[in-house]
Amino acid sequence: MSDNTALRPVLDLVVLDCPDALELARFYSTILGWDLEAGSDRDWSTLVPPGGGVTPERPDGRPSLAFQRIDDFVAPTWPGGAHPQQFHLDFTVLDIDETEPLVLRAGATVHEHQPSENGGFRVYLDPAGHPFCLCRG
């Protein structure tokens, strides 16, 4: 098998389904400090990381985070449930307790299930109900 990196795909976007793309993009913009791309709206919104996203000229850039409105969106249920989570986002922070007020003010809620036995991460729900974690770096 050839190891020609020019032929390998490059991760450009991670896209979250949600009931309102602009609302969820604003939430993640607040907690990450990323810019909302011009032209974002309730159907499709994109956040661009500092320094810009991935481009063909810069395949080692950081992937952007996008949101798309889905009619009849149903939030994932975790752990278990009729609509299981298919993936989640982990954010590394220096101090979970110091960062928690930021995500709560932005609209997150603390998930009732906290499986970390050593306090290395804490689970939250974003305004659309997607689980995400703050992880001690």
Predicted regions: what is each one?
Residues 3-9, 15-65, 99-101, 105-108, ...:
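Core segments of cupin and vicinal oxygen chelate
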Residues 10-14, 85-89:
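Short amphipathic alpha-helical segments
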Residues 33, 94, 134:
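Residue-level marker of positions within ordered structural domains that often coincide
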Residues 54-82, 87-88, 94-97:
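Conserved, structured core segments of small domains
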Residues 69, 134-137:
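Short beta->alpha transition motifs characteristic of CBS
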Residues 126:
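Short, acidic, Ser/Thr-enriched surface-loop or helix-capping motifs
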